[in-house]
């Protein structure tokens, strides 16, 4: 259970970063691979503990000049570190991993090696490349495993900063959950290790960056792209929910794009296993929070369905449906489910979004119903997989 101080219900703090829409922050976030850059002049997006200012990548070394930390962070819980990675010969250069059969072979090779060899990773096993992202707790770098030449993303987090923010448990949860998930639309966590001052997460590299950055670049998406992304996300969430995992922080900043433009869910820091199917902690981005969470009521996996509706709206319109200049106004709009559609949003899209943004969570469409919705079927270029995604991705596990 998250600590009380993680709750979003606190006074807003003005952002001073000159990039992107002004964001009201409560605390900071572990960095993702690709920080989004946004245009100015937009209303504030109210953020909760899982968010931070997206600072443009800065070239710096991840290991130099760091003083030892007296207080040690206990080793992260979860699976043992993954073994030495392996991939096809073509991955010798720092480029996106191949898709299709080559990608399946890479994943199969990795898993076989994981099963046959168990070892402790160290920083010496990797060649460190350019920075991909920078955040409050550390940085993300493009990296290459020396022996196999496998290209990946290495998230480097500083223990002293994790301790000061009191988010060790959040990191442990992210490692525990994400390392066990196998789906083509979920970013893979291969393993982790740590030294005296840092924690390292070995992640799949998503070369096309965040959906947030792409959305800011294009202002909004067309119906075909939106429906395709919603299909991929619904497939991934269906898989997560079948594993009793609730993400709780679905938003453009936490969605990455693979080499073929496929969507990948990342940042599972606010996700939870759901043995009781209920969690009451308020977390994530306020714009994407459902009424039951901001009102402090019990909630289940249906919170992700609400976020799916908000996401679909933002993809088509270019801004979240409940966005306002103040925390209080955003809160009020969500509680009353007050939003309107621009004239250019089609009837099919309006129907889907309206049936997801229901105050009563039991009245929201299920993920299966989302995948079978006429607007999705008419516009998406990807087929639904739902719970069958496990079978479809067995080769990559």
From Swiss-Prot:
Q: Name one Pfam family in it.
A: Pkinase
**Could you mention a single GO BP entry for this protein?**
proteasome-mediated ubiquitin-dependent protein catabolic process
Q: Which reaction does it catalyse?
A: L-seryl-[protein] + ATP = O-phospho-L-seryl-[protein] + ADP + H(+); L-threonyl-[protein] + ATP = O-phospho-L-threonyl-[protein] + ADP + H(+)
Residue ranges of region Activation segment? Answer: 273-286
Positions bearing Phosphothreonine: 280-281
Asked whether the UniProt record includes Phosphoprotein among its keywords, one would answer yes
Biased composition annotated in UniProt, kind: Basic and acidic residues: 103-118, 388-397
Tell me the keywords, alphabetical order.
ATP-binding, Cell cycle, Cell division, Cell membrane, Cell projection, Cilium, Cilium biogenesis/degradation, Cytoplasm, Cytoskeleton, Isopeptide bond, Kinase, Membrane, Microtubule, Mitosis, Nucleotide-binding, Phosphoprotein, Proto-oncogene, Serine/threonine-protein kinase, Transferase, Ubl conjugation
Question: What does the entry report about post-translational modification of this chain?
Answer: Activated by phosphorylation at Thr-281; this brings about a change in the conformation of the activation segment. Phosphorylation at Thr-281 varies during the cell cycle and is highest during M phase. Autophosphorylated at Thr-281 upon TPX2 binding. Thr-281 can be phosphorylated by several kinases, including PAK and PKA. Protein phosphatase type 1 (PP1) binds AURKA and inhibits its activity by dephosphorylating Thr-281 during mitosis. Phosphorylation at Ser-335 decreases the kinase activity. PPP2CA controls degradation by dephosphorylating Ser-52 at the end of mitosis. Ubiquitinated by CHFR, leading to its degradation by the proteasome. Ubiquitinated by the anaphase-promoting complex (APC), leading to its degradation by the proteasome. Ubiquitinated by the E3 ubiquitin-protein ligase complex SCF(FBXL7) during mitosis, leading to its degradation by the proteasome. Ubiquitinated by the CUL3-KLHL18 ligase leading to its activation at the centrosome which is required for initiating mitotic entry. Ubiquitination mediated by CUL3-KLHL18 ligase does not lead to its degradation by the proteasome.
Q: Which residues form the Protein kinase domain?
A: 126-376
According to the UniProt entry, which residues carry Phosphoserine?
Answer: 40, 50, 335
- The answer to whether UniProt assigns keyword Ubl conjugation to this entry is yes
User: In terms of one coarse class, where is the protein primarily found?
Assistant: cytoplasm
Residue positions annotated to bind ATP are: 136, 155, 203-206, 253-254, 267
InterPro entries from the UniProt entry: Aur-like (IPR030616), Kinase-like_dom_sf (IPR011009), Prot_kinase_dom (IPR000719), Protein_kinase_ATP_BS (IPR017441), Ser/Thr_kinase_AS (IPR008271)
Query: Which part of the chain holds the cross-link Glycyl lysine isopeptide (Lys-Gly) (interchain with G-Cter in SUMO2)?
Result: 251
Residue segments, region Disordered: 1-118, 378-397
- What is the documented function of this protein? Mitotic serine/threonine kinase that contributes to the regulation of cell cycle progression. Associates with the centrosome and the spindle microtubules during mitosis and plays a critical role in various mitotic events including the establishment of mitotic spindle, centrosome duplication, centrosome separation as well as maturation, chromosomal alignment, spindle assembly checkpoint, and cytokinesis. Required for normal spindle positioning during mitosis and for the localization of NUMA1 and DCTN1 to the cell cortex during metaphase. Required for initial activation of CDK1 at centrosomes.
Question: What is this protein identified as?
Answer: Aurora kinase A
Q: Which species is this record about?
A: Rattus norvegicus (Rat)
Q: What is the lineage of its organism?
A: Eukaryota, Metazoa, Chordata, Craniata, Vertebrata
């Amino acid at each position: 259970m998250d600590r009380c101080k993680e709750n979003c219900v606190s006074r807003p703090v003005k952002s001073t970063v000159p990039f992107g829409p002004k964001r009201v922050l409560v605390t900071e976030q572990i960095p993702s691979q690709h920080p989004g850059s946004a245009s100015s002049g937009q209303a504030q997006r109210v953020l909760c503990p899982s968010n931070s200012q997206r600072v443009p990548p800065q070239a710096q070394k991840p290991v130099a000049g760091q003083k030892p930390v007296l207080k040690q962070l206990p080793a992260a819980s979860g699976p043992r570190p993954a073994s030495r990675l392996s991939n096809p010969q073509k991955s010798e250069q720092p480029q996106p991993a191949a898709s299709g059969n080559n990608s399946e072979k890479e994943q199969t090779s990795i898993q076989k090696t994981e099963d046959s060899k168990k070892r402790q990773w160290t920083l010496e096993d990797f060649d460190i490349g350019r920075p991909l992202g920078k955040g409050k707790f550390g940085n993300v770098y493009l990296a290459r495993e020396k022996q196999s030449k496998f290209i990946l993303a290495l998230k480097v987090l500083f223990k002293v900063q994790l301790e000061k923010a009191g988010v060790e448990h959040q990191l442990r949860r992210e490692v525990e959950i994400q390392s066990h998930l196998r789906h083509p639309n979920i970013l893979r966590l291969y393993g982790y290790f740590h030294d005296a001052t840092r924690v390292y997460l070995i992640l799949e590299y998503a070369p096309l960056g965040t959906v947030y950055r792409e959305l800011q670049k294009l202002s909004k998406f067309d119906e075909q792209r939106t429906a395709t992304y919603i299909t991929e996300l619904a497939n991934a969430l269906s898989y997560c929910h079948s594993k009793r995992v609730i993400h709780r922080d679905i938003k453009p900043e936490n969605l990455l794009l693979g080499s073929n433009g496929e969507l990948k869910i990342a940042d599972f820091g606010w996700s939870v296993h759901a043995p009781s199917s209920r969690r009451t902690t308020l977390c994530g981005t306020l714009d994407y929070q459902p009424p039951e969470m901001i009102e402090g009521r019990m909630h289940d996996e249906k919170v992700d369905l609400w976020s799916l509706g908000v996401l679909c709206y933002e993809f088509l319109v270019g801004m979240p449906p409940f966005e306002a200049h103040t925390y209080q106004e955003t809160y009020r709009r969500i509680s009353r489910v007050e939003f309107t559609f621009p004239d250019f949003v089609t009837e099919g899209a309006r129907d889907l979004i309206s049936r997801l943004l229901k105050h009563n969570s039991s009245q929201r469409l299920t993920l299966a119903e989302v995948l079978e919705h006429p607007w999705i079927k008419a516009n998406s270029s990807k087929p639904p997989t739902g719970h069958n995604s496990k079978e479809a991705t067995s080769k990559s596990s």
